[in-house]
Amino acid sequence: MTEIVVFFAWTWCLYVIHRSVHVIPILRELHWDHHRYVNTHSTGWQWNNLLLFNDTWPSTADLWITEVIPTVIFSYITGEWWVIWFYYVWAALLQETLEHNPKVNVYPWLTSGKWHLVHHKNTRNNYGVFTPLWDMVFRTHNFKDQQ
């Protein structure tokens, strides 16, 4: 039971951070590189994902600022170190293949390709990482564009 609470607390933190990077100018600039690059060049998993590096330096900085460092801090504060390992498996092995592939649609359980790519088209929607729960809670979800 504790792991479920920790998981949802962590995904809430990532949701808040992801939503914030669309508002804070310097972070928005870094994050925009991710949106621009993935929309035109995403080829799925690559070896550099194992090192938590993306194809461009701004996109890598964005990943570390919005996900990697907050996950480490969250794990340190809560003492729940499994979150780092869970995140690493997701980010290094699955994220590019699942979140940026329009053919993958496992919604409503995960934020898969169709869900996340709506966010790339309309940055006012679908901020959730791993789960669309927080988008539904805060009414930032967009279901219709993923059909």
What are these model-derived regions, one by one?
Residues 1-3:
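Feature marks short, highly hydrophobic, charge-poor N-terminal signal-anchor/signal peptide-like helices
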Residues 6-147:
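Membrane-embedded catalytic scaffold of the fatty acid hydroxylase/desaturase
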